[in-house]
Amino acid sequence: EITAIAWAWIRPNPIVSCYLLGESAAHDMLTAFVAAYKQADLVTGHYIRGYDLPMINGALSEYGLPVLDDKMVQDTKIDLVRRAGLSGSQENLGSMLGLHHPKVKMDQTKWRDANRLTPEGLTLARERVIGDVLQHIELRQRLLALGYLCPPSLWSSGNPHQPEAVYTP
């Protein structure tokens, strides 16, 4: 189950959209995200191809909604230059690069509170997902400036009813 979802358009002073289960119905959270996703030429996140987009597709499927369309994606974990001896976690990269936005820590107990929709848990979940978005925006900008990110690539849900998108540089 998706307890919280957040996103922002990358611009100076981004405004983060955030939805929490318990405050919004899951269907409404998903349709709001999909509407923003469809407007974007490119989406970016930390392990977004490996976790976030597949997780959202699972939730969309559970609610009988169409899965996500193909999209150009830049993933600050998967698209990070090859390296050894260095964790690729967003928290570690943020610390190493001295980012202004810190990683909001949530251990399993705090996530369980959020998943149980307790007021305290939802407050923490909101802080976490908004913090993740803001830190990610800063992280991506820094990684791009340093030349540490590979180019975006096409992500596909594998939807057989959607014509395959073709990327032409």
Task: Annotate each predicted stretch with a short phrase.
Residues E1-P12:
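Acidic, metal-ligating active-site segments
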Residues A4-A6, V34, Q108, P152:
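Intrinsically disordered regions, especially transient/low-confidence alpha-helical propensity segments
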Residues P14-M96:
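Conserved DEDDh/DEDDy metal-dependent 3′-5′ exonuclease domain
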